[in-house]
Amino acid sequence: MHPLAEYPRPAMRRDSCEILNGPWQYAITQTAEYPAAWQGSILVPYSPEAPASGVNRTLQPGQWLHYHRLFAPPAGEGGRVLLHFGAVDYACAVQVNGHLAGGHRGGYWPFTLDITDLLNGTGRNSLWVAVQDPTGHGTQARGKQTLKPGGMFYPAQSGIWQTVWLERVPDNYIQTLTVTPDYDARTVTVRVHTAKPGGAVNLWAMVRAGGVTIAEDWGSDEADQDGEVTLNIPEEHFFPWSPDTPFLYDLTVGTNQGEKAGLDTVHSYFALRKWSCAPDAHGVLRFCLNDKPILLNGLLDQGYWPEGLYTPPSDAAVERELSEVKALGFNLLRKHAKIEPQRWYYHCDRLGLIVWQDIVNGGSAYNLWFVTYLTNALQPLLRRFPDGKACRRLLSRAKPAGREEYAHELADTVQALRCHPCIACWVPFNEGWGQFDAGKAVEAIRELDDTRMVDEASGWFDQGGGDVHSLHNYFYPLRIRPQKRTVALSEYGGIAWPMPGHEPPHKTYGYGTAKDRQELTARYKKLQLKTVLPQLEKGLSALVYTQLTDVEDEVNGLFTYDRAAVKPDANAVRSVNAALAAEFARVTNPAKK
């Protein structure tokens, strides 16, 4: 049985899939050369630093992590064989049967290699992957990873940490699928790019709702390798997506080219929903879903697991955690400093959990005394600190190559995740970590995706752009004032309590510590009902409490790190969320005086 054996890419599915997760050979060496001897077994897709890998070793900058296994191609004849990696942190080279198949840089994004011409006819093929990861010694995106964990920064992880899989496809297969729903027009536009030149692509698409075909059409011929078709959704089958009704349409897409029919077929899904920022009935700017004001009420989600670090123990564990978040009355998760496997977003799409997605932070080593400690203490004075050329060294972005790399990372993130209806907002920068030219980052995001909101600079170093006036507040009295952008409290709370039986083995970290469950519950209720709730009438429209779970030393989660228990009283949390929703409905009601 493979770990994480579910189909890894729900938004672009084919029938052919061979999962390569499981035991591989590994070695950690000082060179890129093929290892003289293998040092043991590693359970892919868990990083060697993760207990679940069976290795429990930390890859150091300058070292090489080598993987090896034998494999057979997927069943079938002809076509092409693709090798997919969900994510490898950070830089890797891949060889098949002793020949270079390709490589990749970037620890959070999927990549695909066509290995057809490197396969032998015996059914026993050799796969070797060599990885390096500089962690904090480079400028690449790394999130909360550090080689010296503690407090708000967590253990580094490296190598293969998402599913590896094979797929047999036709010669001229669909390389990319872009699905763009239009809520106002009640349409969905499907665009494909195919692998092989040689004539215009004929594209066919079919939409089903509840098992019934509701739209089907052929697209007009497009330029070489491209095809596009727009389908109209009948009014009687118009089912808007929301947290209460997360309806997903099934989509099937097929292509042919010239006289050849049925070259490739993929299955996907989409939702009809619309995000905007607009005044409510009283002229106060609000986040709107499907043209109606909505209170975004959620949790900061770091995406760490005790046994797998970045990698969850199972797909069922992910689904269970997200379902429990909804059961507590939350409708939002801010995915913080990490990108998840595609199935995480699929479950959010299906369950109706809204996501604010961070662009993973990078840059050279941070001046934490400035961007975190001093700024937190003097936030009102430093909130509008500039992020232009003169300040790049202070904000860890002095290196041109690092800034160029960030531009690619931003584009890769939006392109990889834009298919997921759950995502409502992109967050290019958090608390000044590697921040630079935030206004240009907003422009770059809008060019790639103009259907979602942008929180230009979460916390501080606000340059006045994007859609969100974004506040982090752990220490100051909360006073919301009218703004020209919609107001979000994008981090707050963080009340710590190391729950007996679940506490970390080392020191604990948080923002004020409760002595027991009763005190934690009382402090949580007081913060939400006495401090936060009155600010809804003044324009507060989104809440992100810190945080979903305990993480390593940081014990300020609503859930324990192992997800075994809710730390405050669960009924009290549900009651608080119901009160917040009721107050938001009251203050946005046109009949309110």
Where are these regions (language model features)?
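Substrate-binding/catalytic cleft of secreted carbohydrate-active enzymes
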Residues: L332-N577, E583-N589
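Surface beta-strand/loop "capping" patches
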Residues: R168-G198, A281-R286, A579-K592
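Beta-strand-rich binding/interaction modules
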Residues: V94-V96, R186-D221, V229
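N-terminal carbohydrate-binding accessory modules
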Residues: L177-T178, T252-V325, A579, E583-R586
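Short, aromatic- and glycine-rich surface loops/edge beta-strands on solvent-exposed regions
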Residues: S126-V129, T245-N256
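Accessory carbohydrate-binding/adhesion or oligomerization-edge regions at the termini
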Residues: M1-S53, A130, P134-T139, I160, ...
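Signal that preferentially marks extracellular ectodomain short beta-strand elements
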Residues: L113-L118, T230-P246, L529
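Accessory beta-strand-rich segments of carbohydrate-active enzymes
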Residues: E6, P10-A11, Q25-Q30, R57-I174, ...
